[in-house]
Each structure stands twice: as C-alpha cells, then as structure tokens.
Regions:
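Conserved S-adenosyl-L-methionine
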Residues: 132-136
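Glyoxalase I/VOC metalloenzyme domain signal
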Residues: 3-67, 75-131, 147-199
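Short acidic/glycine-enriched loop/turn segments that link adjacent beta-strands
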Residues: 69, 138-142
C-alpha cells in the first residue's frame, strides 16, 4: 500500500513473511493483520566510504548486501526492524540542516542500558566523531544523538523502565495526546499545529 504524507513524503506498507515480531493485541484489528513496525530505513548518501567506516567500526553494523547503488547494513541481531539501506547518490546536491514539514529528523536505535549507551558515545568520540550529544532526558527515554558522515542523524536511546506508561495507564495509551515533560510548556502551540483526525 503506497501513500503520501500531505507534504509529499512517500511511504509504503509492505507485507512480509519473515517478520517474527509480536503484534499489538486487544485492538479492533486482528493480530495477524497488525503492523509490526518499521522493517527498514533508507538513507541517501553522496559517498559510501566514510559511512562504511562509521557503520562497521562506529555503529557496529554488518554489511549484508551491496550492488554499488544500494548498500544494506543490519545492526544487532539483524532482521526486520534492524535494517538500514543506504542509497549512493554522488550527484545529489547536499542537503540542508533545515527540516521541513513531513521530513524525517533522525532515526532511533534502542540500546539495552545506560552503560551501553555511554560506551557507544565514548567509542564514537574516540573514533573522532565529535558531533555526539550529551544524554537528553526525553521523559520516556534517554537519548544521545550523532550526526553521521552521510548527514543523517542517528539516535541511541534507552527506554525508562515504565516507558510510555510513566504518565498514563497502559489501558489508556493512545486515547489522549501526551507531551514529553520538556515540551509541556508548548503544548497548546504544538496541538494547534496538528491536523484534525476524523473518527
């Protein structure tokens, strides 16, 4: 199922057989038809050389496919949800740091704990990647961010023990718009920018 964000960003829902992630249950959609999550992410890059070093040495990825135009890496145990596809586009004009409506700001990767997150931060800095943030408390999780050689921003995040249930009970998740603590002062402004959802 191909569709577009109102701003023109293209998306596709694709059915696959090899996704063994457990779906959400308890909703109106049958579990076997539920979306399991993101299968892969795609990143455009002008030059593969520096990104290859970052992915393999810095981010711990494994290159599993390369046809010269598209390079696929897997992180962690690989498989659905752990795939990153890089499209090599040497003639593409460099991007801008201005993020427009509908654009993806960064890609998040879960790490197991704060120790692992700190090790990754110090490892990246030791390799010379200086654009690594300090830990940011996002209310539901703690994050660090790094600007990769491709220009894409990656996030390494550690979920808080209670995750999204830190500010609402599990049986009420998704019924109200919840705002992370650091953004609550801007809630009215943020809500005004959201489009209206029809039942």
């Amino acid at each position: 199922l191909d569709f577009q964000h109102p701003c023109g960003v293209e998306y596709a829902l694709v059915a696959i057989d090899e996704d063994d992630r457990k779906p959400h249950t308890g909703g109106p959609v049958a579990p076997e038809l539920m979306i399991r999550g993101t299968y892969s992410i795609g990143v455009s890059m002008r030059d593969a050389e520096f990104m290859e070093e970052f992915m393999q040495v810095g981010w711990g990825g494994t290159r599993v496919a390369d046809d010269g135009k598209l390079i696929r890496y897997e992180v962690g145990e690989g498989g659905a949800g752990a795939i990153i596809d890089f499209e090599v586009e040497p003639d593409r004009k460099p991007g801008t740091w201005i993020v427009g409506e509908g654009a993806i700001h960064h890609m998040a990767f879960q790490v197991d704990n704060h120790e692992q997150q700190n090790e990754l931060k110090f490892h990246l800095e030791g390799l010379g990647y200086t654009d690594v943030s300090d830990v940011k408390d996002r209310g539901y999780f703690d994050s660090i961010y790094v600007r990769t050689p491709s220009g894409a921003m990656f996030e390494a995040t550690v979920s808080h023990d209670d995750g999204f249930t830190c500010d609402e009970p599990a049986d009420k998740l998704g019924l109200e718009v919840m705002i992370a603590p650091q953004l609550k002062v801007s809630k009215e402004e943020l809500m005004a920018q959201l489009g209206y959802l029809k039942d």
